[in-house]
Amino acid sequence: MDSLHVSSTSVLVDVVEAVETATSLVVDTAEAVATEQATPTAVISNALARSAYAAHTSLSYLAWAFGLWFLRLIGWVCYGIPTYVLGLLGRTINISLQFSSLLLILIALVTVVVAVVRYKYLTVYSRLPQEQPRQEPEIDMYDESDNEDEKTGFANYFDEFLSAVKIFGYLERPVFHELTRHMQTWKLSADEMVPLDDEQGFSVVVEGTVQVFAKQSSFVQNPTSVPDSRKEDSIMFNGERYTLLSEIKNGAPLTSLFNILSLFTDDLQLHKNFDSAVNSPMTSASDVPNMSLSSDGSDDLQKGEPQFGEPRLSEKPAAKLSVTVRAATDSTIAIIPAAAFRRITKKFPQATAHIVQVILTRFQRVTFQTGHHYFGLTPEIFQTEVNLNSHARNELPGYLREGAVKKLNQVYDASQMGGRPKKYTVTLNKKNKGKGSRRQRFSVQLNNQGHLNSQSRMVSLDSLEAVGDHMNPGDLLTNVPLSRQGRPVFELSSVKHKASIQNLSFSGNDDENEDTALRTALVEAIFKVLGIDRDSIQSSIMAVKTMSNTASPMFTGATTGGSSGSLGEELRSRRTGQDSLGASHFGVGLPSERSQNSFYARSETSTSSVDEDSLMAAPFDTIRNDVAQYMDVVLFKKDSLLIKQDDPTPGLYYLIDGVLEVGYTDHHKIYHDLYTVQPGGVGGYIGSILGHRSFADLRARTDVYAGFLPRAAIERMSDKYPMVHLTMAKSLTKVLSRLLLHLDFAMEWVQVRAGQKIYKEGQEADAIYIVLNGRVRSVAETKGDSGIVGGESGDAKDGKSHRKNLTSIGEYGKGESVGELEVLTLTRRPSTLVAIRDAELAKIPRALFESLALHYPSITFEISRIVASRVRTLMEDSAPIPRRMHTFDMAAHHDSYLTIAVVPISQDVDVSEFGRRLYNGMQAVGREACHLNHASVLNHMGRHAFNPLGKLKLSGFLDDIEDRYQTVLYVADTPPGSSWTHTCISQADCVLLVADARSEPDIGEYERVLVKMRTTARTEMVLIHPERYVPPGLTSAWLKPRVWVHTHHHVQMDLPRHEADVLASIRKMKRTGTLANLKNKVQTIQEEFRSMYRPKANIYSTSSANKDDFNRLARILSGQAIGLVLGGGGARGISHIGIIKALEDSGIPIDFVGGTSIGSFIGGLYAKEYDLVPIYGRAKKFSGRVSSLWRMALDLTYPATSYTTGHEFNRGIWKAFGDSRIEDFWLRYFTNTTNITHSRMEIHTSGYAWRYIRASMSLAGLLPPLTDNGSMLLDGGYVDNLPVSEMKAQGASVVFAVDVGSIDDTTPMNYGDSLSGAWVMWNRWNPFGRHPNVPNLAEIQARLAYVSSVGALEKAKHTPGVIYMRPPIDDFATLDFAKFLDIYRVGNKYGHKFLTELREDGKFPAIPGMENVKTKHKRTIARRNSI
């Protein structure tokens, strides 16, 4: 150190000397100049020389000094410091401290270390990154129709007319021109009245509003009984009083569906006996030998005799209504003359048949279906069949009837030789002779249960050979397909696919001729019932010939592609096309492209000529012979069910011998007898003609011998021979009851587009609406928050209006009604009704409802029951205290969806495979589903399906598909901008966005199309994972930028990741990466490439059917979800694990999970893992932490708010859930908490799981409330300890509710009007006291806290669809977590015992997907003219 100091001093001395030298040089130069002793040049030269020397000397010294200083510094570091350290270590230091001082130092040190560990390392859970809350989906109504009423002139006139003629379906250009060529218009002034005659034609209101009145004498039996309140709705016209039926506005037709059918079929003639019988006003029930109507069906069944007394239905068939119209305002009516419809029938018979089928379909949807399901007018509907059979006195000749009965009995007796049960249905089928045979076998499997729990089976025989000695006993039963299903299934079976059947035949040509005669007689008998005979067809032919020189294929049969053929060839070509359909492996049979497009091809050439001889040749024999090939003769034993209610009608039955009874089961599960069918009558007429599900059961009261004509044969016959179809439609118009005519005339068929408002909030309630097709949503504007994100006001500079705060009141699908309450109470609309997608509705005007209520009180009762049921549901669903959900509250309307669009996020997702698996899931849960993709639609409709002309045909086809199936899957397997993708989205009630969870959560091209289309349908996201594991925060990254997604699902499915995806990820990482994480990038890239070429085992895959993700998704989408609700109760909730194990052992699937307190913890683990093993381990670890006395003791704090800080409890929960969000749980999950800041219950479905589960478990006093956005949250059990109502609102149909709460002490108290504390203490400690212990302050406060929860629990026990379970855990206390195994075993034992008893008692609910559900047979889509 001393040497270093000396060297530094010498350096400084040298520097100072150099500076002094330079200074003296400057001074000398200045003096020389001042004294002028030298010249200036000399002075300057001398100065420069001296300055150069001085500078050189200074630099040398500086360089030398720096080098010396650096060398000495190295020496100090290498030698000086070690020497000093060694010297310091060699010294002896003595420190003297007292023990108390040392102890204080150690305590301080430990305190610092503990504080650092406690508040920095053990509180990671409290420092999780705060996420901005996701903007919840809002309800948007993209309606641009507010200013439509302002349109005037020709544009509005033409639009309204086109809107009205949509009722005809698709019209080709020649047909449209023919209809509108002679169109007329009427101008009506306000209050002007004119009679509306059917002969005038088809009328449309194109401007203004018109009121329709019906003659009161034909509508109300006693005109004087009209109350004064209805006088204002009635008028006097030509001396008659008329009652208001409806009010028609612009764009709606004035002509009813019935009148439209009459316009097309007026020139057709029916069987003369048909007209005379139907038009006879004296026809009564007593005159009808083949029909009977009983007022008390149960008595008739007991007596076993048909009744012919006075019927309770109107016997008089339909007659033309006397209707007049009055213009409420200045109005314009457009009329298409009746003559135009007659010309259409002659020139375009195939197009006419198509239009008539469309009208019949809408007549069935609007009038029949509404009358059956809504008004309860099933008896009036079946009065149609009563009127039809009233003239059917054409029984078979005795020898034919006796021969058929004898042969069927022989076959039946032969079948009994095998020792089989005695309940059979035997069918005699004609023998197929070689390849030239034109007959195919239609087998109708009727596998039903009779009144005596007997099964009805059908034996199909392909020949009519006599039963001889060559037949061995049991041959028949060992070779025929005997089905044991419990419900009838209609199946078209081709010859090449039929099962091997032992044939019984009647040998000899005489027997075959007799069989042919029998079938021919049966066909003629059915034709006569339908009004068809040789004379009526011949007269129609002559009428056409005399009225038109243009030949028509109306009677000779339409050909396909220029070739002619029989009905059998048509059926064979149709079946062959079905077998070749590419979508057949999906389990859906679609008609072939040829069979579908043949109609359109024929329609375009319907004006082609046929030679005159074909017109003169009567085709009756051809039609009869073709139909006879498909006529079966069947035997049904007593109590067999021929047609089941709500099942497709298999065909038309003509009764040869025996008695058939018709009855139906109403909404209250009460069976009603309607009438009986005697020999000579027909059954299944309405379902066969209209092609819809049956409204009633058709059962054999005795052994029944009948002729059976399959519905498919009727449909193909109607297509091949349009005249037959038109004649059947005319016969239907002749037998309708008067009440159905009034319904048809007053009810309006309304078609709305997606986003269109049907009515607005605050408008006067003038009608009830029933959804026929599509989906609508009821939306109300609520007061309060404006809904503007960021707090900006609605008065923006861009002039946009303030966004309304809308709330979804409900969604209504097919068959549901809306608006009854306002119509009955004469109040204004409380909400706005908007169409989610293109929809068809039936509008029931208030005037019609009031008029019907006067004459038919049963209608009033039905509507009153509906309204009362809805009011009761609203009252039951109303929460006792306000509640708030942290998500978009549309789950309450999560019913069964009819149409579901499967749309990928991007083209990299294999949506076809997903759609196929979802279709299989729908079938596994018992849904009748149809899978449509681009290929199947093109194969069915042809390559022009998506052209502007083909879209109308496609729309009709899709409507027909949606009417036949419970669920229709639209798979968007085409590019985003394609027509099929747009069709899938526009047709959907629910859109499933399918995404690969491994890809980047960017907005895909399909989503842009979805947003651009502005669809209002519910949108749900499906994240596909290769393993049953979701990384924390992944779901939130997908949902946050997608405000249009309402909810999400996690599904496990293998999706191969292509090399292009990996390279895209590499390029993205190159753009955004830095050198710091290069190693991680390389490792990630290596792992990506390995995953492409290396098979990877699924760590959480399961083969259990009850855990199949696609079955779960199918149950949720079809409204059949299974929910599990776990209640709170402290340590007693460990029994939840045992019950979950019992549920899994029983094969019960779980789709939704909800819980309170400890139930939220166990339920959250199950929803996250969806596996019992990790739940058991994590729950046991948590119980060990909570039961640790040391942990609880260290967590104690001053009891200002609670006894503990909550830290140990928080860590126990966080150890189980980590930083997972509720959205990351595999199953949909919710938990409830009590918000003591705003005094309400809150439902949590998103956010950090541990926080809201901890809040739901926060027992007041033991744990402090958890703060969330400024609110304090406590245990949800204070409000609802078993949140069953919320689970039902989420969409669960069956809920397993497990209650582990403490039992309420309801011991009666009687201690007088005053109470002494000393007496309470004495009574509590006195072992001989007779009074019950009086609760202390803490117990009273606890009872007050659980008051609302007790009421909610009692309500949950009696909620329909809830299976209440309470294990025997009353011996365990709330904090007995140390008894984990004991409590678990109690729950497991109780769960197995409870479920076993539930099965034995027959109370086990039907759970779809739990086992192999017996689904209906796959039905093919029979092509209809309505397509």
Curated annotation (Swiss-Prot):
<dbReference type="GO" id="GO:0016042">
    <property type="term" value="P:lipid catabolic process"/>
</dbReference>
<feature type="transmembrane region" description="Helical">
    <location>
        <begin position="61"/>
        <end position="81"/>
    </location>
</feature>
<dbReference type="InterPro" id="IPR001423">
    <property type="entry name" value="LysoPLipase_patatin_CS"/>
</dbReference>
<comment type="function">
    <text>Intracellular phospholipase B that catalyzes the double deacylation of phosphatidylcholine (PC) to glycerophosphocholine (GroPCho). Plays an important role in membrane lipid homeostasis. Responsible for the rapid PC turnover in response to inositol, elevated temperatures, or when choline is present in the growth medium.</text>
</comment>
<protein>
    <recommendedName>
        <fullName>Lysophospholipase NTE1</fullName>
        <ecNumber>3.1.1.5</ecNumber>
    </recommendedName>
</protein>
<keyword id="KW-0443">Lipid metabolism</keyword>
<feature type="topological domain" description="Cytoplasmic">
    <location>
        <begin position="1"/>
        <end position="60"/>
    </location>
</feature>
<dbReference type="InterPro" id="IPR000595">
    <property type="entry name" value="cNMP-bd_dom"/>
</dbReference>
<dbReference type="Pfam" id="PF01734">
    <property type="entry name" value="Patatin"/>
</dbReference>
<feature type="region of interest" description="Disordered">
    <location>
        <begin position="281"/>
        <end position="315"/>
    </location>
</feature>
<dbReference type="Pfam" id="PF24179">
    <property type="entry name" value="NTE_Ploop"/>
</dbReference>
<keyword id="KW-0677">Repeat</keyword>
<feature type="domain" description="PNPLA">
    <location>
        <begin position="1124"/>
        <end position="1288"/>
    </location>
</feature>
<dbReference type="GO" id="GO:0004622">
    <property type="term" value="F:lysophospholipase activity"/>
</dbReference>
<dbReference type="Pfam" id="PF00027">
    <property type="entry name" value="cNMP_binding"/>
</dbReference>
<feature type="active site" description="Proton acceptor">
    <location>
        <position position="1275"/>
    </location>
</feature>
<dbReference type="InterPro" id="IPR018490">
    <property type="entry name" value="cNMP-bd_dom_sf"/>
</dbReference>
<dbReference type="GO" id="GO:0046470">
    <property type="term" value="P:phosphatidylcholine metabolic process"/>
</dbReference>
<feature type="transmembrane region" description="Helical">
    <location>
        <begin position="97"/>
        <end position="117"/>
    </location>
</feature>
<feature type="active site" description="Nucleophile">
    <location>
        <position position="1157"/>
    </location>
</feature>
<feature type="short sequence motif" description="GXSXG">
    <location>
        <begin position="1155"/>
        <end position="1159"/>
    </location>
</feature>
<feature type="short sequence motif" description="GXGXXG">
    <location>
        <begin position="1128"/>
        <end position="1133"/>
    </location>
</feature>
<keyword id="KW-1133">Transmembrane helix</keyword>
<feature type="binding site">
    <location>
        <begin position="615"/>
        <end position="735"/>
    </location>
    <ligand>
        <name>a nucleoside 3',5'-cyclic phosphate 1</name>
    </ligand>
</feature>
<dbReference type="GO" id="GO:0005783">
    <property type="term" value="C:endoplasmic reticulum"/>
</dbReference>
<feature type="region of interest" description="Disordered">
    <location>
        <begin position="787"/>
        <end position="807"/>
    </location>
</feature>
<feature type="binding site">
    <location>
        <begin position="731"/>
        <end position="870"/>
    </location>
    <ligand>
        <name>a nucleoside 3',5'-cyclic phosphate 2</name>
    </ligand>
</feature>
<keyword id="KW-0442">Lipid degradation</keyword>
<feature type="topological domain" description="Cytoplasmic">
    <location>
        <begin position="118"/>
        <end position="1427"/>
    </location>
</feature>
<dbReference type="InterPro" id="IPR014710">
    <property type="entry name" value="RmlC-like_jellyroll"/>
</dbReference>
<feature type="topological domain" description="Lumenal">
    <location>
        <begin position="82"/>
        <end position="96"/>
    </location>
</feature>
<comment type="similarity">
    <text>Belongs to the NTE family.</text>
</comment>
<dbReference type="InterPro" id="IPR002641">
    <property type="entry name" value="PNPLA_dom"/>
</dbReference>
<feature type="short sequence motif" description="DGA/G">
    <location>
        <begin position="1275"/>
        <end position="1277"/>
    </location>
</feature>
<keyword id="KW-0378">Hydrolase</keyword>
<keyword id="KW-0256">Endoplasmic reticulum</keyword>
<keyword id="KW-0472">Membrane</keyword>
<dbReference type="GO" id="GO:0005789">
    <property type="term" value="C:endoplasmic reticulum membrane"/>
</dbReference>
<feature type="compositionally biased region" description="Polar residues">
    <location>
        <begin position="281"/>
        <end position="296"/>
    </location>
</feature>
<dbReference type="InterPro" id="IPR016035">
    <property type="entry name" value="Acyl_Trfase/lysoPLipase"/>
</dbReference>
<dbReference type="InterPro" id="IPR056556">
    <property type="entry name" value="NTE1_P-loop_dom"/>
</dbReference>
<dbReference type="InterPro" id="IPR050301">
    <property type="entry name" value="NTE"/>
</dbReference>
